[in-house]
Design a protein with these regions (language model features):
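Short, basic/aromatic beta-hairpin or loop at an interaction surface
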Residues: 5-21
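Residues that form ligand- and interface-recognition hot spots within folded domains
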Residues: 10, 43, 60
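Short beta-strand-centered aromatic/proline hotspots
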Residues: 49-59
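Short coil-to-beta transition motif at edge beta-strands of beta-rich domains
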Residues: 30-43
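A generic structural signal for short beta-strands and their flanking turns/coil linkers
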Residues: 35-37, 50-52, 84-86
Length: 135
């Protein structure tokens, strides 16, 4: 099992509403995530912190089976996908945490060694720190 930090942009998608309504979210699968991997969801500005702990419930979901989440999109142009695209489903496994101790600066202080420009693996030190906030 691997642990990952994925980003969610609230200026492009109503992530909090979607997770509240469905208990999961689907992403275009670009990383080698596998079922059972842990996902920490980092919410970008204005929050700038980890707010969700999730598990990969399903990977390699074909486009035809992916959920239509377009009503939650805030983008002016709809996303376009091709038939070969696959998606991954992250299911919540803990309640949302709204704590500024999970900001990027604090993650760096606890072993995270990356920028927030893309989704990244999480080492044990960082995972233990993040996990301490989730019950």
């Amino acid at each position: 099992m691997n642990k990952w930090l994925f980003r969610a942009n609230t200026s492009r998608f109503r992530i909090h509403d979607f997770i509240r309504d469905y208990g999961f979210v689907e992403y275009l699968q670009t990383k080698n995530v596998q079922e059972g991997d842990i996902i920490y969801l980092y919410i970008t500005a204005p929050y700038k912190r980890v707010e969700y702990k999730m598990i990969v419930e399903r990977a390699n979901i074909p486009l035809r089976e992916a959920i239509d989440d377009s009503s939650y999109s805030l983008k002016k142009q709809p996303s376009t996908f091709v038939d070969s695209d696959v998606f991954v489903r992250f299911k919540t496994i803990a309640d949302r945490v709204e704590n500024d101790e999970l900001c990027y600066k604090k993650l760096l202080e606890h072993g995270f060694n990356y920028t927030m420009q893309s989704d990244r693996p999480v080492n044990d030190e960082t995972a233990e720190y993040i996990d301490s906030f989730f019950k």
